[in-house]
From Swiss-Prot:
Pfam families: DNA_mis_repair, HATPase_c_3, MutL_C. The gene is mutL. It comes from Flavobacterium johnsoniae (strain ATCC 17061 / DSM 2064 / JCM 8514 / BCRC 14874 / CCUG 350202 / NBRC 14942 / NCIMB 11054 / UW101). PANTHER family: DNA MISMATCH REPAIR PROTEIN MLH, PMS, MUTL, DNA MISMATCH REPAIR PROTEIN MLH1. This is DNA mismatch repair protein MutL. The keyword Plastid does not apply. InterPro entries: DNA_mismatch_repair_CS, DNA_mismatch_repair_MutL, DNA_mismatch_S5_2-like, HATPase_C_sf, MutL/Mlh/PMS, MutL/Mlh/Pms-like, MutL_C, MutL_C_dimsub.
Length: 644
């Protein structure tokens, strides 16, 4: 019987390995950029087309490779970074496995040009699907250029799994930002479809952060510096008032390598304890330097997770250093960011009871009499006190006495003036409430609605725990989730405006000026046509900020920044699937931002409007995110609970 276990050919093994190393164009960008950094380059250029699906090219001015190394670098497990297993615990480079280039070459058309400084000629190699197509000498500048074209050309299934260009571009942007932030001493430039997105000269940490994020970031940064025997911390955290709803601007770098660590993130959040609103996330850019032998990098395929020898000590040091920096720069705890400090009660008035203001009208005053008569009233009402003060009707003294004597002289005009309304003051208030006028008004009002509407309006609604709305129905009762219900209402409104109707817009007296990073600005430019159909009005675009002169009528000015921030976050996190349209994504994101939140108190009228609005929707049963908006409970079900 023949053997059924066989060795796989190299190109097949490389394709299988590529599934682990290369998941999307961003994976190629990461590997090539890190190789350029390891090559001691001082100038790195990234060029992509169609979000990296058609082309990913990285050009550097590093040390280059010899002819032999240029050929060997595409072999599996061929690397210049380590020689033995012990080297894994003293790594000072990004790559070390020797799998990246072999895996990329197995699933793409790849072209490499490289030359060392001391060589007169360089090497030009073309590979397609792990097969060497050509190798020749060429006149080249110092450094290396890798061009990866037609990614996954021989694995159509993998290519079909790629997301839209917007999502894939965002992943590429993330990888570029991480490498560029980790190495501010290197000049980086980034081009997409022929347009320059970034041109970052070599600078310090602060300048690099501002260059990538936006010019407004500079005023948000609080420096953090701590140097101990086991860790050195440098970087910046943002002031609490600039906290965001998403975690897009949170970066940890350990030994100049971007990592993700929920444990260290918890330390940062602990340092902000009492400074942030619920659900807000602070931005931070923290650079940690630790001895290489105290960490293990080789535990994750993308090397973004690290094991530390003494995590608890690092946690305590990181938390204390951030807390110290926030205190040093006078960032005091503030529990309520929405409170207006101008409305605070002065300290010396806190224990004083408020007095009910008294209003008195001089019934003797007649604007149609001559000045002498009015002067007589004034003199009669004057004295040591004001004629309009109450005096409690029992105050003694000449002032008070003259005041009352003055009024007593004009009793007759007052009585005659009041005689015009004889009988009104003697009516019982209950009689007034049940007057024929009120009955007539009720009759007219009821005639404006049909019987169904009156019956629906008469149904009482109740809010439970500021989360659910309960309303009786014929079969029992309905329980509505107020947050999901409002999401459904807003979602259908926005979608209708974007697809059928042109939404109304309210013009702002003072246009809003909002700053964003280059990547966010590119997303906003792509979203502008759809956002304008919802009621937004944009002025001429700038490089790092947008000017909004009009907003939808159902959005307040203070909510604009939150809405756009949430939309950018959803797009950056890859929430919209490829099957969703851009309009659908925008409508969902805006509905999520503006919907009434759990914990919000609603008046009875607001509850009624919410319930009626939900059942007026085309699909009231589920929220835009496929979650139930309400449940019904029949009387029979309630009876069963009571075992009736």
């Amino acid at each position: 019987m023949s053997s059924i276990i066989q060795l796989l050919p190299d190109h097949v093994a490389n394709q299988i390995a590529a599934g682990e190393v290369v998941q999307r164009p961003a994976s190629v960008v990461k590997e090539l950029l890190e190789n350029a950094v390891d090559a001691k380059a001082t100038d790195i250029k990234l060029i992509i087309k169609d979000a990296g699906k058609s082309l990913v090219q990285v050009i550097d001015n590093g040390v280059g490779m010899t002819v032999t190394d240029a050929r060997l670098c595409f072999a599996r497990h061929a690397t210049s970074k380590i020689r033995q297993a012990e080297d894994l615990f003293s790594l000072g480079t990004k790559g070390f496995r020797g799998e990246a280039l072999a895996s990329i070459a197995a699933i793409a058309h790849m072209e490499m040009k490289t030359k060392q400084e001391q060589d007169e000629l360089g090497t030009h190699i073309v590979i397609e699907g792990s097969k060497f197509v050509s190798q020749e000498v060429a006149v080249l500048p110092k450094g290396t250029s890798f061009a990866v074209k037609n990614l996954f050309f021989n694995i159509p299934a993998r290519r079909n799994f790629l997301k839209s260009d917007t999502v894939e571009f965002r992943h590429v942007m993330d990888e570029f930002q991480r490498v560029a932030l980790a190495h501010p001493n290197i000049h980086f430039s980034f081009y997409h479809n022929g347009s320059e997105l970034y041109n970052l000269p070599a600078a310090g940490y602060r300048q690099r952060i501002v260059g990538i994020m936006s010019g407004k970031t500079n005023e948000k940064l609080v420096p953090v510096n701590e140097d101990t025997e086991i860790i050195s911390i440098q970087g910046f955290v943002c002031k609490p008032e600039f906290a965001k709803k998403n975690r897009g601007e949170q970066f940890f770098f350990v030994n100049d390598r971007f990592i993700k660590s929920g444990y260290l993130h918890h330390a940062v959040m602990a340092a902000y304890d009492g400074l942030l609103k619920d659900g807000s996330q602070p931005s931070y850019f923290l650079y940690l330097q630790v001895p290489p032998n105290t960490i293990d990098i080789n535990i994750h395929p993308t090397k973004t997770e690290i094991k530390f020898d003494d995590e608890q000590a690092l946690y305590a040091i990181l938390r204390a250093s951030i807390k110290h920096s926030l205190g040093q720069f006078n960032v005091a705890p503030v529990l309520d960011f929405d409170r207006d400090s101008n409305l605070d009660t002065p300290y010396h008035y806190k224990d004083v009871e408020a007095e009910v203001p008294t209003i008195q009208v001089d019934g003797t005053f007649n604007p149609f009499t001559d000045d002498k008569t009015n002067q007589h009233y004034t003199k009669a009402g004057s004295g040591s006190g004001s004629g309009y003060s109450s005096g409690s009707s029992s105050s003694s003294g000449s002032g008070s006495g003259s005041s009352y004597s003055g009024y007593s002289k004009r009793v007759e005009p007052t009585v005659s003036w009041e005689s015009l309304y004889v009988g009104l003051d003697t009516e019982n208030p209950e009689t007034i409430e049940s007057s024929p006028f009120i009955f007539e008004n009720e009759e007219v009002t009821s005639s404006l609605f049909n019987d169904d509407e009156v019956e629906q309006a008469s149904q009482k609604t109740y809010q439970i725990h500021k989360k659910y709305i309960v309303s009786p129905i014929k079969s029992g009762m309905v329980i509505v989730d107020q947050h999901r219900a409002h999401q459904r209402i807003l979602y259908e409104q926005f979608l209708l405006n974007m697809t059928v109707n042109q939404a109304s817009s309210q013009q702002l007296l003072f246009p809003l000026d909002l700053f964003y990073s280059s990547s966010e600005m590119k997303l906003i430019e792509e979203l502008k046509p759809s956002l304008e159909t919802t009621g937004f009005v944009f002025e001429e675009a700038q490089t790092d900020h947008v000017v909004i002169s009009g907003i939808p009528v159902n959005i307040t000015e203070s909510e604009v920044s939150l809405v756009i921030e949430q939309l950018l976050s959803d797009l950056q996190d890859g929430i919209p699937a490829s099957s969703y349209s851009q309009n659908d994504t925008i409508a969902k994101s805006m509905a999520k931002s503006l919907a009434v939140k759990t914990g919000s108190y609603l008046t009875e009228k607001e509850q009624d409007n919410l319930v009626n609005g939900l059942f007026a929707c085309k699909d009231p049963n589920i929220s835009p995110f496929q979650k139930p908006t309400f449940i019904t409970m029949r009387v029979e079900d309630i009876d069963k609970k009571f075992a009736l």
